[in-house]
Amino acid sequence: HPQIVANSIPFNMEADSLNCSILGAKAVPGTPEFDLFINEVSREITVKAGQKCTAIRRAIVPQAQVEAVTEALKASLRNIPVGDPAVEGVKMGSLVGKDQVEDVWSAVRQLGSCSEIVHGGTPDFDVVGADRDRGAFFPPTLLYCDKPMAAATAHSVEAFGPVTTIMPYHNT
């Protein structure tokens, strides 16, 4: 735009997107890259309870690493206490409200048409220092989409909460 060029007007735009993180084929368990991938995806799922537009919604991994990534993410997420952030040790708080909880459940149901839940995704989970039924809590949830190239829903539906879908790729 001419005004931006002429007057150097600051401009910041956020475009709606389903962000992803892609694990390289040589990043296998025991490598720093694999560990970094697991740490970052786990962090992105749980920071702000996944309520940020830049959160990783799709974890794209080599087919040969799907099981290792899934197990490592599940192990990491099991160590994330959900509840009142004022309580020592709690790592993930609530969603913004009950309407948001229902929106995330709805998105998970839609994603379930092409994915399976491999962690979380159930209303039966522990909440520390708060009442799960009175609050707006949602469990860290992992899905697995076996055929992402044939699953338009996995690339168009965003669960705006602590939800990520693992997707394999087959060639490098």
Regions found by a protein language model. Give the residues of each.
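Glycine-rich nucleotide-phosphate-binding loops and adjacent flexible coil segments
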Residues: 162
